[in-house]
Amino acid sequence: MKKSLISAVTQALAVLCVALLGGCTKELTETPPSRRPLVVYMALDNDLRGEFSSRLAALRAGWRPGMELWVYADTPEGASLGRMDSTPEGVALHTVERYGEENSASGATLERVLRTVWRLCPSDGYGLLFFSHATGWLPAGTLGHPSGSRSVGSDHGSEIELESFSAALPEGMPLDYVVFECCLMAGAEVMLELQGRTPWVLASSAEVVAPGFRPLYESGLEVLTERTRPVPELLAAFGQSYMSHVEGLSGEYRSATLSLIRTSSMPALAEAVRRVTRGFADEEGRDTPPAGLQHFDRPGAYGDRPAAARFYDLEAYVEACLADPDAEAAFRGALADAVVWRDATERFLGGDGSPYKGFDIGRHSGLTLYVPRGEFPALNETYRRTAWWQATREEVY
């Protein structure tokens, strides 16, 4: 792991800079900010490095007086944490701390950033927008190498394991939501792991096609920092704005999935899934998933061999494994309670048969899950250690 390059002088200058910024940098006893502070975490020390300038410009365009917008960016030039503010020359990102070269795909780095904002900007609620590469619960590395452990962010090939990401969200910090501007993060495995860390997650079952949420920053920051409406209403509004934007695009760019998950409902959903499938008893002796299941990844598009789907629609798979019809109504209710909003285009990257290995979207429950298969014995073994597996596979008598 790369070492932090913070010096005592840099720390002193950072503290001085913070004192000059004002705004949120007050004592804990003072009144919290009128708007919800938003932390934008950009892990860009990878092939996303070219996104920094355009994203920073979009964030500046979306900032309004009274907003507490904190931006962490890790680029090949080094990492830093800044706070957006107005200057005589216009809106600018004031550097609060410089870190030099470091690994942003580290739970320790994410936790340090969140704790810094929590300390400098006391509030009774925060939001986190996380932008990077991601592969959901899948093993670290690439989609083409199914081995290792669950991953979220990417930095020069390093990735944050899912458990490390969850643990990096500080206990006690009132993190109202996480918005994943990342690929393949709306997995049941991910949401169960985040239960107890943040109550709401906005994420995509499929990949997020560039430029992602960037076109929404100018108008969307108002929504993400608002306090007057309930959090799920705000996130659904942000999500719907994104989907409306995508619906207005053409060709392969008209591709998106998005869902809003109540993480506190995930344990009940896992139990309902276990009961309705009798612990997925149907999986015994089966090497491949049932044919025709809706999936949200693009097998073969990542250099993966063998090329096989790994992100299936949760509802579609449960229906294929239905073992207790009397428990079906409870499952439907638990799913509706967990997924409070969802939307998707009719096809992704051109749909079935496209040169981009896209797919049609006939089903979209808002959650995905992995289905064990014979081609991936190491991946199957890793999957058996996830909280989702353990919560759903015990046989029901």
Spans of features found by a protein language model:
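Bacterial N-terminal signal peptides that target proteins for export
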Residues: 2-13
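C-terminal motif of bacterial Sec signal peptides marking the signal peptidase cleavage site
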Residues: 20-23
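N-terminal extension/subdomain marker
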Residues: 25-122, 383-384, 389
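Terminal, contiguous helix-loop blocks that mediate binding/assembly
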Residues: 29-31, 115, 136, 143-397
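Loop/turn elements at helix/coil->beta-strand transitions in domains of secreted/extracellular proteins
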Residues: 34-37, 65-69, 121-127, 172-177, ...
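Short beta-alpha junction loops
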Residues: 44-45, 72-78, 133-134, 182-184, ...
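Surface-exposed loop and adjacent secondary-structure segments within mature catalytic domains
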Residues: 72-95, 130-156
